[in-house]
Amino acid sequence: MRLALRIAYDGTAFYGFQRQPGLRTVEGEIIRALTKLGIIEDVESSNFKGASRTDRGVSAFFNVVAFDVASRPDLVRPEVLNFHLKDVWVLGTAEVPEDFHPRFWAKSKTYRYYLIDAGFDEKAMRECAKLFIGTHDFSAFARLEPHKNPVRELIRADIIKRQGYYIIELEGKSFLWEMARRIVNALRFCGLGILTEEEVEKMLNGEYSRKIPPARPEGLVLWGIEYEGIEFRGNEKGIRKAKHDLFERYSEALTRAALFGDLLLGL
């Protein structure tokens, strides 16, 4: 039997998703819990796979892992797993085909970036965002790896205005390393008048050697992954711990924001 988990996590608590010797990672935390419960024996025999290897500091509301169950499939429930996990929350489970790979079966991925309003020219940001939609060579907007094709398709680039901040939502079939964060910084630079639409077009066409640095990872969330025929099921009991933990983090963040806001006003 092969099962998949829909997971959320606080990326600031980990050194990224992928296992690294001596470091706390999302993948390592999940594998620790699964082996402790006897659900899997080890990574190799369980064919453990993840959908997205998010960087250090990047959070997720919808990432996916899959594995072959060695025993105790009855324990693969959000309420059981969440009791044994820290800073990771299982929001749903699904039985999947034996050849299911969460990365290769994904139809699209959606990232959200939360950006404090620094007096941006919203119109300039929106015009700049339109340039990224479609199929392009994103070499100027990614940390390139030798074996990766830099051509990718961005399905949409939405800018959502909220009170005091923006949400930049990017959906694509796949993303290069740091691609989402570098696109965000390009939009930020356009909004600040540091970068023009013409320069962005030249970079996408390979006519301009300038590279855009990545935005900070803490503002990025893997928001969604689309699959065909895979339905993740959860329940209120299963997500109770997630709600409690996220509210604690939300309360702490609001307290610190209020504190530093008053310090800033007092200067």
UniProtKB/Swiss-Prot annotation:
The active site is at D55. One of its GO terms (molecular function) is RNA binding. Keywords: Isomerase, tRNA processing. One of its GO terms (biological process) is tRNA pseudouridine synthesis. Gene3D superfamilies: Pseudouridine synthase I, catalytic domain, C-terminal subdomain, Pseudouridine synthase I, catalytic domain, N-terminal subdomain. Pfam families: PseudoU_synth_1. It comes from the Archaea. It catalyses: uridine(38/39/40) in tRNA = pseudouridine(38/39/40) in tRNA. Formation of pseudouridine at positions 38, 39 and 40 in the anticodon stem and loop of transfer RNAs. Belongs to the tRNA pseudouridine synthase TruA family. This is tRNA pseudouridine synthase A. The lineage of its organism: Archaea, Methanobacteriati, Methanobacteriota, Thermococci, Thermococcales. The gene is truA.
